[in-house]
Amino acid sequence: MNNLLLVALGGSIGAVFRYLISIFMIQVFGSSFPFGTLLVNVLGSFLMGVIYALGQMSHISPEFKALIGVGLLGALTTFSTFSNETLLLMQEGDWLKAALNVVLNLSLCLFMVYLGQQLVFSRI
């Protein structure tokens, strides 16, 4: 299958997952903090770490990378929404939540990429 079609397929799945997760998180926690965006970014970072490590250990096809790495995870995670939500919190004068959003997204996402890699590498 053409890699472009695989990216589109993965992207459509990732976008639907992001939407459903965001709606669920709003229903559970309300909308005063962007928990949905945080969750999809953290989850996507973990999965990206796993995929990267698997690629280092064995051959992962370009098609799989296009479908999952670029398509699904690219659409699941969202830096632009994170940036917009952080700016909105700042514009509302909620500097603490804005700072918390930045710190949590960056630190948790970096840690989850690392954790995903380590879980795969430790199983060698």
Curated annotation (Swiss-Prot):
**Reaction catalyzed:** fluoride(in) = fluoride(out)
Q: Is Transmembrane there in the keyword field? A: yes
Which is one Pfam family of this protein? Answer: CRCB
Cellular component terms per the entry's GO annotation: plasma membrane
Metal-binding listed as a keyword: yes
This entry's Gene Ontology molecular function terms read: fluoride channel activity; fluoride transmembrane transporter activity; metal ion binding
- Describe regulators of its activity: Na(+) is not transported, but it plays an essential structural role and its presence is essential for fluoride channel function.
**This protein's UniProt keywords:** Cell inner membrane, Cell membrane, Ion channel, Ion transport, Membrane, Metal-binding, Sodium, Transmembrane, Transmembrane helix, Transport
Q: Where in the cell is it found?
A: Cell inner membrane
User: Which membrane topology describes this protein?
Assistant: Multi-pass membrane protein
Give the highest taxon in the source lineage.
Bacteria
Q: Where are the transmembrane segments?
A: 4-24, 35-55, 60-80, 102-122
Which biological process annotations from GO are given for this protein? cellular detoxification of fluoride; fluoride transmembrane transport
Q: Which residues bind Na(+)?
A: G74, T77
List the signal peptide residues: none
Main localization is: membrane
Q: What protein family does this chain belong to?
A: Belongs to the fluoride channel Fluc/FEX (TC 1.A.43) family.
Q: Which HAMAP family match?
A: FluC
Q: What does this protein do?
A: Fluoride-specific ion channel. Important for reducing fluoride concentration in the cell, thus reducing its toxicity.
Which protein are we looking at? Fluoride-specific ion channel FluC
Q: Which organism is it from?
A: Shewanella oneidensis (strain ATCC 700550 / JCM 31522 / CIP 106686 / LMG 19005 / NCIMB 14063 / MR-1)
User: Gene that codes for this?
Assistant: fluC
